[in-house]
């Protein structure tokens, strides 16, 4: 079933949700499932996908790629104390040693003295020293190095190809297992996105949506071009706070929201919602509410479902917060704020004027037939204060709409005509509002494609009283 959410929920699949009896309790609260191949084996991830599809085939499956990353290669957890000096060596495979930090970056000898090695998003910090030709690090921030953890280098850019062989293999695996989107890690610029798309074309994956994760200093500098090149973005808040201070990070998020809105792309923000701590949960809930009012499309639970003690409660809580806040935002766009694409000028003007109509006339809902999902996505990005009910024949389109705030989609048959859509839309509105709708309430119907692929379809807007649809 396709349950209606205002902002959308993205959840990471992990052992905490790997039983049908558990997943079935929360699947209606989740729009997109993130599959992370950096941890765990492919057979387990295949099991996750099969289970999701069995319970609800309408969900979007998003594969998380590694990106050009470096990871620890210690076979066991390693305890590091502040001030401790630890040898750092390259290892392609996991090694069993409690006194050396192993990493899978081959050019360790090129890492300059003074470089800060950041393990697991700032959990542990090590300053590189060079002693007699061997790489040694002094622990600046102590902690437990878990197995296969991600490493960043401050003030040093490792020599790595953007799209490595492992990511290529994972993407091919994802296509074979019918994933609908990929979230690409450590994007730096639009060229990285283009490289992903070029590879997707070679493996018959053109339909896969590319969602860029904003988590590098280069991505911050090239934010606008990355948003334009990708199908949407994920804001990694913790990474931003490592890269810059909170004031600048907040400005980055606000700029990203505005630009995504003006060109019609979804923006997703990760969250570490944790209901096990009432005080922490209350503070996190306030942040979520604030971002909802600014126009964030979706919230991604990562650690919350991966290692949290109460993953189901975290999902329920996020869903509750989202639906308490409703659809309305603080945004109000004029035409000068909207990026009109030269190739879609007619569609974009129709969509914008539908949005303005929804602001100026008290309408109850928007019915939006869409072929590629473009019209519904652009409408959603402008954030009208009413639900958008989208109809599409296209599998790729409705999977994408699972990222779009305020959109409830329905798959229709190729034989559907315009009169069918109007009548079904009317019944859906009746159900959606639980009968709380009057005969004189106004409904807007929008279609902005020059291709007549539904018999009797207009290209423009129609405004009806509910009783006249």
List PLM regions with ranges:
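Non-catalytic helical/linker scaffolds that mediate oligomerization, partner binding
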Residues: 1-469
